[in-house]
Amino acid sequence: ANHAQAQMLSGHIQGKVLEFISTISRPKYILEIGTFTGYSALCLAKGLQPDGELHTIELRTEDANTCAKNFEQSELHKKIHLHVGNAVDIIPALPYTWDIVFIDADKTGYITYYEMVLPRLSENGLIIADNVLFHGQVLDEKVSGKNAVAINAFNEHVAADERTEQVMLTVR
């Protein structure tokens, strides 16, 4: 991993878990919020139906350029649509009902993204949120730091949401 922020990469085991979830779900439409290098998008895309599509949103142009190159090297590149910009602006413009949504972007935006995609989730759809333990920091008696506080608020928000069932898995 020659990226300055390589610690943010999804690991091999996490990639296999995403691939497994996608494969058993057989989604037609997947939304990924936060692409980074594109690894998790490629893992998720492996389970798409033959006519399925994965739409992934990346805010940072430099990372989007890396993703585009990585996607082009994959046999799945025709199924993956990369959108560059702010997810809050892009999500409403995508006219799909999502079978899987993978949230792995700015931690302070998780609740916003969750609320944006939930009404457009298919009946048996899945929302997968990465980093919900935030390096164990949300388990501290006093949660501190902008991102840890945001993830803790997201966890509490989802746990209190009667519209969904929740499962927390620790995968790295």
Q: What feature does the model see in each segment?
A:
Residues G11-R172:
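S-adenosylmethionine/decaboxylated-SAM
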